[in-house]
Amino acid sequence: MNIQLSPLEARVIGCLIEKEVTTPDHYPLTLNSLTTACNQKSNREPVLNLSEAEVQDTVEGLIARRLVSDESSFNSRTSKYQHRFCNTEFGDLKLNQQELGLICCLLLRGAQTPGELRTRTNRLCTFTDVKETEAVLERLANRDSGALVVKLPREPGKRESRYHHLFCGEVDMAAFATSSDNEANASSQYAELEQEVAALREEVAELRALIEQHLS
């Protein structure tokens, strides 16, 4: 896979993909609209507070790499931007609607489970069920031309593993595994504390019964 993005570039590309599908009448986006989309509180993780200057710098870098284009007319005072991230005439990256929806949501929110992705992509594409969502994710993870996503170690107490995109570089699997181990240890310690509290309550109840017998 040749496309590598910074976290801010991933946010900009994700927003352009999202708005192309969800608000086609207002696409391509002006700088103001794109900044608002980048700082949106819903369907964003983390929530950012970028200035227009920061977004402009990021967009200019993406334009230089031909991942974004300025579609404003010659006499227009306002620039309007659209992504050239995938499905362009001469580009190598081709994604169907389901694949694009998943990549978009992963760019905007980071690691998520198939169940979360199925719910959060409902305005971008349609999945019959979670199994279909996971099947498409596995296809993206096992592309002959290079994986676009990776399956992360399953978190303690969770039924599903999360998936993460690879457009910002390789994911530190050891860090995720350590995080999962830490959560498992914390859960184990919590269970031990619960058992100790239960035992102490029994002892208190027994002592209270003895005291009541003595007083009576």
From Swiss-Prot:
Tell me the superkingdom of the source.
Answer: Bacteria
Family listed:
Belongs to the UPF0502 family.
Descriptive protein name:
UPF0502 protein VC_A0740
Q: Which organism is it from?
A: Vibrio cholerae serotype O1 (strain ATCC 39315 / El Tor Inaba N16961)
